[in-house]
Amino acid sequence: MVIGLKEKYKTTVTQALKEEFQYENIHEVPRFTKITINRGLGEASQNAKALESSIQELTLITGQKPIVTRAKKSIAGFKIREEVPIGIVVHLRKDKMYSFLEKLINLTLPRIRDFRGISPKSFDGKGNYNLGLREQLIFPEIDYDNIDQIRGLDISIVTTAKTDQEGLALLKKLGMPFRES
């Protein structure tokens, strides 16, 4: 029987982290708050099709419709006017978050060419992990024939961990493939 990531966290990971870091209360154990998937689209101001195809791709990947982010100020150097779409973002919480994380760990990351693990140095100092992917083709939902251009995306995994060591231990115990540094 395959055990889900949320069940694995509740049954084995919380107890292991509680023993490893000597937490007195179960609520001190780090947990996931949200996962944010972001894609910057500089060309969206000139190419409306790029925005539409990116929205469709992120909807397929996450199962949730992304929010269009717009420019707050006009910047002549970047040829951006105020209120022009410049990116899209999705915030995943609860079951969709665990489902996406399980798919990322077990299906998506192993499909990267020459994959030797992800860097353990991408923590922000507060236990949150940031990951940049260079292409959307590694996701099983994306069909190679239906994309117009290869675009990357950023994934931020937000946890309640106080330190990077706690966040690293949480992700390692859930099976995140970190490379040995």
From Swiss-Prot:
Cellular localization per UniProt: Plastid, Chloroplast
PROSITE patterns: RIBOSOMAL_L5 (PS00358)
Chief location category: plastid
Matching InterPro entries: Ribosomal_uL5, Ribosomal_uL5_bac-type, Ribosomal_uL5_C, Ribosomal_uL5_CS, Ribosomal_uL5_dom_sf, Ribosomal_uL5_N
Gene Ontology cellular-component terms listed: chloroplast; ribonucleoprotein complex; ribosome
Pfam families (UniProt xref): Ribosomal_L5 (PF00281), Ribosomal_L5_C (PF00673)
Keyword list, A-Z: Chloroplast, Plastid, Ribonucleoprotein, Ribosomal protein, RNA-binding, rRNA-binding
GO BP annotations, alphabetical order: translation
GO function terms (MF aspect): rRNA binding; structural constituent of ribosome
Matches recorded under Gene3D superfamilies: 3.30.1440.10
Family according to the record: Belongs to the universal ribosomal protein uL5 family.
Biological role: Binds 5S rRNA, forms part of the central protuberance of the 50S subunit.
PANTHER family xref list: 60S RIBOSOMAL PROTEIN L11-RELATED
Subunit structure: Part of the 50S ribosomal subunit; contacts the 5S rRNA.
Protein name in UniProt: Large ribosomal subunit protein uL5c
Organism per entry: Porphyra purpurea (Red seaweed)
